[in-house]
């Protein structure tokens, strides 16, 4: 630092530094070498049928990274997206072609789903009988934000009487007990009961091609139903569908 202090750049800091240097020198791409030969459609150590992805967009890689994919850190991908720096993810041990992380406009999508990610360290918290009025959700999440507790999926039920509703959200399992404690000590909100389920997992499918492909949501839900897997919560965006299930 300017004051001469020495500190660690943290996990993924070397990747982000490499991207920053590539941007400064305006190189054609930034090559990141790791212990795998690219980005896979899922964890190849757990899913034998996982396939290496030749090209993936910044947005898709950001989603997969945030959902637990460990090949690239979100900070490096975000820096590359802002600076429009193409990334080549390659193996240190082979000469095989890796994965290109590039602008979405330069990818010709032939498949709707690019990758599948999962995490086993989630918790689901539900507040029953919350007052149905403006500002309540903000009051619930304010102390969590101040205590650096990240909230992921949020689902609010439709109020049937216009007075009370239910609010469900997910956090990391390591934060759930602290979150419950903060909620119980929060005098700004009123609710009837609070439930915690800290034995849940999250499964997500990611793909920029989903927005133009009808039926992806149905296929995912049908696949889970055929395996008798019940969905506890659902969250969607243009390029991601996430569900919470029992562990």
Predicted feature descriptions by range:
Residues 1-247:
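C-terminal catalytic "cap/lid" subdomain
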């Amino acid at each position: 630092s300017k004051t001469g202090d020495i500190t660690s750049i943290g996990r993924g800091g070397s990747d982000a530094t490499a991207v920053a240097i590539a941007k400064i020198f305006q190189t054609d791409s930034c090559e990141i070498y790791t212990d795998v030969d690219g980005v896979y459609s899922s964890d190849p150590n757990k899913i034998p049928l996982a396939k290496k992805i030749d090209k993936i967009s910044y947005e898709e890689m950001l989603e997969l990274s945030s959902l637990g994919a460990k090949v690239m850190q979100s900070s490096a991908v975000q820096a590359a997206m802002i600076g429009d720096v193409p990334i080549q993810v390659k193996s240190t041990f082979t000469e095989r072609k890796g994965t290109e992380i590039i602008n979405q406009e330069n990818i010709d999508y032939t498949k709707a789903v690019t990758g599948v990610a999962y995490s086993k360290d989630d918790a689901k918290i539900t507040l029953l009988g919350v007052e149905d009025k403006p500002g309540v959700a903000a009051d619930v999440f304010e102390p969590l934000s101040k205590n650096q507790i990240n909230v992921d999926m949020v689902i609010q039920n439709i109020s049937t009487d216009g007075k009370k509703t239910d609010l469900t959200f997910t956090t990391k399992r390591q934060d759930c007990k602290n979150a419950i404690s903060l909620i119980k000590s929060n005098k700004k909100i009123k609710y009837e009961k609070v439930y915690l389920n800290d034995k849940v997992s999250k499964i997500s499918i990611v793909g920029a091609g989903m927005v133009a492909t009808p039926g992806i949501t149905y296929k995912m839900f049908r696949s889970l139903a055929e395996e008798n897997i019940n969905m506890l919560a659902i969250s969607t965006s243009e390029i991601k569908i996430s569900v919470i299930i029992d562990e």
